Amino acid sequence: MNPLHSTQKFQGRVIRVSVDDVQLPNGLRTQLEVVHHPGGAAVVSLDAQERVCLLRQYRYVADGWVWELPAGKLEPAEPPLATAQRELEEEAGLRAAHWSSLGAIFSSPGVFSEVLHLFLARELTQARAAPEANEVFEVHWVPLQEACERALDGDIRDGKTALGLLRAAHQLRAPAHRPEI
């Protein structure tokens, strides 16, 4: 992003909000409100029975419980894979021997700069979970096919989770598309 001018309106612990003067590709000059976020990573972790680890997590902003993949924000200078590995261990108490990329997505590109990196993790082993004090969730193991059906029928409403599940199922049907990392 290269604004003509940017005015910071808010700086929080995670996000920054600015009003940017920009020139669009069609030549129009306008002001846009932008929420700057460091980005994040989410993990579709599959066990040997092709079950996925899902968190049923309380989210204040959603006013209730939401099904989500283990995920978290990128720390400064932290590669997305390292974020994914850290979050999988902290939230689910898991490590994985094999990782592959499921690509990256925008959470809401009209307003947010956040890019979410999606990963598939396999050959899981137990580790010590260390969730943050403000994280309230339950860990559930759901067959991947059932999780995809839940994403398609609207039971799973979190975008990164729904798309991560569908991309993982697609990659497993056509594994040559994404190399292991």
Locations of the language-model features?
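Acidic pyrophosphate-coordinating catalytic loop
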Residues: 8-12, 60, 105-116, 173
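Unchanged
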Residues: 30, 39-42, 47, 73-159
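Acidic, metal-coordinating catalytic segment for phosphate/diphosphate chemistry
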Residues: 6-42, 48
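Generic C-terminal helix-cap and adjacent flexible tail
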Residues: 170-181
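A glycine-rich, hydrophobic loop/mini-helix early in the fold
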Residues: 40-64, 68
